Amino acid sequence: MVVAKVCGVRDAGAAAAAAAAGAGFVGMVCVPGRRRTVGREEARAIAAAVRGAPGTRLVGVFQDQAPEEVLRLQRELGLDAVQLHGAEDWAAFRAQLPASTLLIKSFVFPRDCEAALAMHRAARGRNCMVLFDAAGGGSGARLDWAALAAWGAAHADVQFMLAGGLTPANVAEAARLPGVVAVDVSSGVETGGAKDGNKIRQFVENAKGI
Protein backbone atom coordinates (compact mmCIF):
# COMPACT_ATOMS: atom_id res chain seq x y z
CA MET A 1 0.00 0.00 0.00
CA VAL A 2 1.27 3.47 -0.90
CA VAL A 3 2.18 5.67 2.06
CA ALA A 4 0.97 9.28 2.21
CA LYS A 5 3.14 12.16 3.42
CA VAL A 6 1.59 15.48 4.40
CA CYS A 7 4.31 18.11 4.30
CA GLY A 8 4.57 21.78 5.19
CA VAL A 9 2.62 21.31 8.42
CA ARG A 10 2.86 24.44 10.57
CA ASP A 11 0.88 23.61 13.69
CA ALA A 12 0.00 20.70 15.96
CA GLY A 13 -3.63 20.69 14.83
CA ALA A 14 -2.70 20.01 11.22
CA ALA A 15 -0.20 17.37 12.31
CA ALA A 16 -2.84 15.64 14.41
CA ALA A 17 -5.33 15.79 11.52
CA ALA A 18 -2.81 14.18 9.17
CA ALA A 19 -2.01 11.45 11.67
CA ALA A 20 -5.69 10.80 12.36
CA ALA A 21 -6.30 10.48 8.62
CA GLY A 22 -3.67 7.75 8.43
CA ALA A 23 -0.73 9.63 6.92
CA GLY A 24 2.46 7.62 7.25
CA PHE A 25 4.61 10.75 7.33
CA VAL A 26 4.07 14.28 8.62
CA GLY A 27 6.66 16.77 7.41
CA MET A 28 7.67 20.18 8.69
CA VAL A 29 9.95 22.64 6.95
CA CYS A 30 13.10 23.44 8.93
CA VAL A 31 14.68 25.62 6.23
CA PRO A 32 15.01 29.24 7.43
CA GLY A 33 13.04 31.92 5.61
CA ARG A 34 10.46 29.79 3.81
CA ARG A 35 6.72 30.45 3.86
CA ARG A 36 6.02 27.20 5.67
CA THR A 37 9.04 27.29 7.99
CA VAL A 38 8.16 26.42 11.59
CA GLY A 39 9.65 28.05 14.68
CA ARG A 40 11.08 26.14 17.61
CA GLU A 41 7.91 26.10 19.71
CA GLU A 42 5.70 25.12 16.77
CA ALA A 43 8.15 22.35 15.88
CA ARG A 44 8.05 20.97 19.40
CA ALA A 45 4.24 21.03 19.42
CA ILE A 46 4.11 19.24 16.06
CA ALA A 47 6.61 16.66 17.29
CA ALA A 48 4.51 16.01 20.39
CA ALA A 49 1.37 15.56 18.27
CA VAL A 50 3.06 13.05 15.98
CA ARG A 51 4.68 11.11 18.82
CA GLY A 52 1.20 10.45 20.17
CA ALA A 53 0.08 8.90 16.87
CA PRO A 54 1.25 5.31 16.32
CA GLY A 55 2.12 4.59 12.71
CA THR A 56 2.98 8.17 11.75
CA ARG A 57 6.59 9.27 11.36
CA LEU A 58 7.89 12.81 11.76
CA VAL A 59 9.98 14.28 8.93
CA GLY A 60 12.18 17.36 9.05
CA VAL A 61 12.84 19.04 5.70
CA PHE A 62 16.23 20.72 5.21
CA GLN A 63 18.12 22.38 2.36
CA ASP A 64 21.87 22.96 2.24
CA GLN A 65 22.14 23.38 6.01
CA ALA A 66 25.13 22.51 8.16
CA PRO A 67 25.16 18.86 9.21
CA GLU A 68 25.56 19.97 12.82
CA GLU A 69 22.28 21.89 12.65
CA VAL A 70 20.42 19.01 11.02
CA LEU A 71 21.73 16.49 13.53
CA ARG A 72 20.87 18.77 16.45
CA LEU A 73 17.29 19.21 15.32
CA GLN A 74 16.98 15.50 14.61
CA ARG A 75 17.92 14.79 18.21
CA GLU A 76 15.93 17.63 19.79
CA LEU A 77 12.72 16.92 17.91
CA GLY A 78 13.05 13.16 17.67
CA LEU A 79 12.79 13.22 13.88
CA ASP A 80 12.06 9.81 12.40
CA ALA A 81 13.25 10.98 8.98
CA VAL A 82 15.46 13.71 7.55
CA GLN A 83 14.60 15.02 4.08
CA LEU A 84 17.34 16.78 2.11
CA HIS A 85 16.33 19.18 -0.68
CA GLY A 86 19.61 20.74 -1.72
CA ALA A 87 23.02 19.74 -3.05
CA GLU A 88 23.91 17.83 0.11
CA ASP A 89 26.20 14.82 0.14
CA TRP A 90 23.57 12.29 1.19
CA ALA A 91 26.20 9.67 2.10
CA ALA A 92 27.86 12.04 4.58
CA PHE A 93 24.53 12.66 6.30
CA ARG A 94 23.70 8.97 6.26
CA ALA A 95 26.96 8.19 8.02
CA GLN A 96 26.16 10.63 10.85
CA LEU A 97 22.45 10.02 11.37
CA PRO A 98 21.18 7.17 13.56
CA ALA A 99 20.67 4.02 11.51
CA SER A 100 16.98 4.03 12.45
CA THR A 101 16.45 7.51 10.96
CA LEU A 102 15.18 7.37 7.39
CA LEU A 103 17.08 9.61 4.97
CA ILE A 104 14.97 11.00 2.11
CA LYS A 105 16.89 12.73 -0.69
CA SER A 106 15.06 14.91 -3.18
CA PHE A 107 15.93 14.74 -6.87
CA VAL A 108 14.48 16.77 -9.74
CA PHE A 109 12.86 14.60 -12.40
CA PRO A 110 14.08 14.06 -15.08
CA ARG A 111 17.23 16.12 -14.57
CA ASP A 112 18.63 14.08 -11.68
CA CYS A 113 17.67 10.55 -12.70
CA GLU A 114 21.25 9.32 -12.89
CA ALA A 115 22.07 10.75 -9.45
CA ALA A 116 18.93 9.17 -8.01
CA LEU A 117 19.83 5.83 -9.52
CA ALA A 118 23.37 6.09 -8.14
CA MET A 119 22.04 6.76 -4.64
CA HIS A 120 19.58 3.89 -4.90
CA ARG A 121 22.38 1.49 -5.80
CA ALA A 122 24.82 2.77 -3.19
CA ALA A 123 22.26 3.00 -0.39
CA ARG A 124 20.79 -0.49 -0.51
CA GLY A 125 19.93 -1.63 3.00
CA ARG A 126 20.89 1.76 4.49
CA ASN A 127 17.40 3.18 5.20
CA CYS A 128 17.32 5.72 2.38
CA MET A 129 14.56 6.78 -0.02
CA VAL A 130 14.57 8.64 -3.33
CA LEU A 131 12.09 11.52 -3.69
CA PHE A 132 11.26 12.82 -7.16
CA ASP A 133 10.00 16.41 -7.24
CA ALA A 134 9.86 19.40 -9.57
CA ALA A 135 12.65 21.98 -9.59
CA GLY A 136 12.52 24.11 -6.47
CA GLY A 137 10.22 21.79 -4.57
CA GLY A 138 7.01 22.93 -2.94
CA SER A 139 5.95 24.77 -6.10
CA GLY A 140 2.92 22.62 -6.81
CA ALA A 141 4.26 21.90 -10.31
CA ARG A 142 3.35 18.45 -11.60
CA LEU A 143 5.97 16.19 -13.15
CA ASP A 144 5.64 14.52 -16.54
CA TRP A 145 3.92 11.37 -15.33
CA ALA A 146 4.18 9.60 -18.69
CA ALA A 147 7.96 10.03 -18.66
CA LEU A 148 8.09 9.06 -14.99
CA ALA A 149 6.07 5.91 -15.64
CA ALA A 150 8.43 4.93 -18.45
CA TRP A 151 11.45 5.53 -16.23
CA GLY A 152 9.90 3.58 -13.36
CA ALA A 153 9.09 0.65 -15.63
CA ALA A 154 12.65 0.63 -16.97
CA HIS A 155 14.09 0.66 -13.43
CA ALA A 156 11.71 -1.72 -11.70
CA ASP A 157 13.98 -2.19 -8.69
CA VAL A 158 13.81 1.51 -7.75
CA GLN A 159 11.07 2.49 -5.32
CA PHE A 160 10.53 6.19 -4.68
CA MET A 161 8.39 8.91 -3.15
CA LEU A 162 6.60 11.22 -5.58
CA ALA A 163 5.89 14.92 -5.03
CA GLY A 164 4.83 17.77 -7.25
CA GLY A 165 1.30 18.92 -8.01
CA LEU A 166 -0.47 16.14 -6.11
CA THR A 167 -4.05 16.66 -4.94
CA PRO A 168 -6.89 14.49 -3.60
CA ALA A 169 -8.22 14.37 -7.17
CA ASN A 170 -5.10 12.96 -8.85
CA VAL A 171 -3.26 11.05 -6.13
CA ALA A 172 -4.92 7.72 -6.89
CA GLU A 173 -3.51 7.87 -10.42
CA ALA A 174 -0.10 8.90 -9.08
CA ALA A 175 -0.08 5.99 -6.63
CA ARG A 176 -0.43 3.54 -9.52
CA LEU A 177 2.67 4.76 -11.36
CA PRO A 178 5.52 2.21 -11.53
CA GLY A 179 7.94 2.58 -8.63
CA VAL A 180 5.81 4.86 -6.47
CA VAL A 181 5.66 3.68 -2.85
CA ALA A 182 4.91 7.04 -1.21
CA VAL A 183 3.20 10.29 -2.23
CA ASP A 184 4.06 13.72 -0.84
CA VAL A 185 1.63 16.65 -0.69
CA SER A 186 1.68 20.18 0.69
CA SER A 187 -0.24 22.89 -1.18
CA GLY A 188 -2.59 20.27 -2.63
CA VAL A 189 -4.29 19.85 0.76
CA GLU A 190 -4.50 23.54 1.62
CA THR A 191 -7.34 26.04 1.47
CA GLY A 192 -6.38 29.69 1.63
CA GLY A 193 -2.79 28.75 2.47
CA ALA A 194 -3.71 26.62 5.49
CA LYS A 195 -3.91 22.85 5.80
CA ASP A 196 -7.48 21.62 5.29
CA GLY A 197 -8.49 18.59 7.37
CA ASN A 198 -11.05 17.38 4.84
CA LYS A 199 -8.58 17.59 1.96
CA ILE A 200 -5.97 15.77 4.04
CA ARG A 201 -8.40 12.94 4.76
CA GLN A 202 -9.45 12.69 1.11
CA PHE A 203 -5.83 12.68 -0.04
CA VAL A 204 -4.79 9.90 2.33
CA GLU A 205 -7.84 7.77 1.54
CA ASN A 206 -7.38 8.16 -2.21
CA ALA A 207 -3.64 7.44 -1.97
CA LYS A 208 -4.36 4.21 -0.14
CA GLY A 209 -7.28 3.29 -2.37
CA ILE A 210 -9.71 3.23 0.56
UniProtKB/Swiss-Prot annotation:
Signal peptide: none annotated. GO terms for molecular function: phosphoribosylanthranilate isomerase activity. The keyword Amino-acid biosynthesis applies. It catalyses: N-(5-phospho-beta-D-ribosyl)anthranilate = 1-(2-carboxyphenylamino)-1-deoxy-D-ribulose 5-phosphate. It is an enzyme of class 5 (isomerase). Pathway: Amino-acid biosynthesis; L-tryptophan biosynthesis; L-tryptophan from chorismate: step 3/5. GO terms for biological process: L-tryptophan biosynthetic process. Its EC number is 5.3.1.24. Pfam families: PRAI. SUPFAM superfamilies: Ribulose-phoshate binding barrel. It comes from the Eukaryota. Keywords: Amino-acid biosynthesis, Aromatic amino acid biosynthesis, Isomerase, Tryptophan biosynthesis. Belongs to the TrpF family. HAMAP family: PRAI. This is N-(5'-phosphoribosyl)anthranilate isomerase. It comes from Eremothecium gossypii (strain ATCC 10895 / CBS 109.51 / FGSC 9923 / NRRL Y-1056) (Yeast). The lineage of its organism: Eukaryota, Fungi, Dikarya, Ascomycota, Saccharomycotina.
